[in-house]
């Protein structure tokens, strides 16, 4: 079910980005989209194994949360996982050896709903596993409804596709101004993918942007970035396993 929903969100935002593009000119299915989808398919089995394995084997957490009503279970689980993802993403940009792997994601020179699938396997492992481990260590979720954790993870998947989408949004619309008070969007996340290294190290939040505002990592500009990608002089080819990163030393972020 998770794979079906993820695919549905990506198709929706791909089509919207093609029909109402923020940056026009890219065909609906291009080389980057096909590469990202292939890479995501290769990592899907690993994702399922991680989720099932980690959630099944972790001991009960420090904070008893099993008696919470379902709506509170979703809220607490969502906030904790999103907060953990913010800090893992922050480390990806601040720790040089993590950036070596994370820059595969930033190698995309155009944005679309599949860009979130463009990940080195090492980057994928730590970004997926660490938040789940922290979640399991902090919260005792025995007694939680079985649909709560898939729901929380599903929100993250949908927002990941949305924030990378090449969709032109009406920045002045009333509903978008309300949305932008707390939630991520392509307008906000675009600056995280700028080729300008001085502006790229910010906007780390996945679903909520309140973490960036709280910890002063928010980057906002009136116009969209002039270019996306990395500018270290080492062009990253569409290599699903990105073995060249294990042979070359990438420049540190920023």
Locate each region found by the language model.
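Structural signature of hydrophobic alpha-helical transmembrane segments
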Residues: 1-15
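Membrane-interface helix-loop junction between the first two transmembrane segments
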Residues: 15-34
């Amino acid at each position: 079910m998770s794979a079906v929903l993820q695919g549905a969100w990506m198709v929706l935002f791909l089509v919207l980005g093609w029909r109402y593009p923020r940056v026009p000119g890219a065909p609906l299915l291009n080389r980057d989209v096909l590469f990202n989808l292939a890479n995501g398919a290769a990592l899907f089995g690993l994702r399922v194994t991680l989720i099932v394995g980690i959630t099944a084997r972790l001991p009960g957490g420090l904070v008893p949360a099993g008696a919470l009503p379902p709506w509170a279970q979703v809220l607490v689980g969502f906030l904790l996982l999103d907060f953990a993802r913010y800090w893992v993403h922050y480390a990806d940009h601040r720790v040089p050896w993590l950036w070596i792997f994370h820059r595969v994601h930033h190698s995309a020179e155009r944005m679309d709903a599949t860009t979130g699938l463009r990940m080195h396997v090492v980057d994928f492992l730590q970004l997926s596993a660490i938040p789940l481990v922290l979640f399991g260590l902090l919260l005792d979720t025995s007694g939680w409804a079985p649909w709560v954790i898939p729901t929380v993870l599903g929100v993250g998947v949908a927002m990941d596709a949305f924030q990378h989408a090449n969709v032109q949004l009406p920045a002045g619309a009333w509903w978008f101004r309300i949305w932008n008070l707390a939630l991520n969007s392509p307008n906000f996340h675009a600056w995280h993918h700028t080729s300008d290294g001085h502006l790229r190290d910010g906007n780390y939040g996945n679903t909520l942007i309140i973490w960036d505002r709280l910890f002063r990592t928010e980057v906002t500009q009136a116009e969209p970035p002039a270019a996306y990608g990395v500018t270290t002089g080492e062009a990253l080819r569409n290599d699903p396993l990105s073995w060249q990163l294990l042979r070359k030393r990438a420049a540190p972020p920023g």
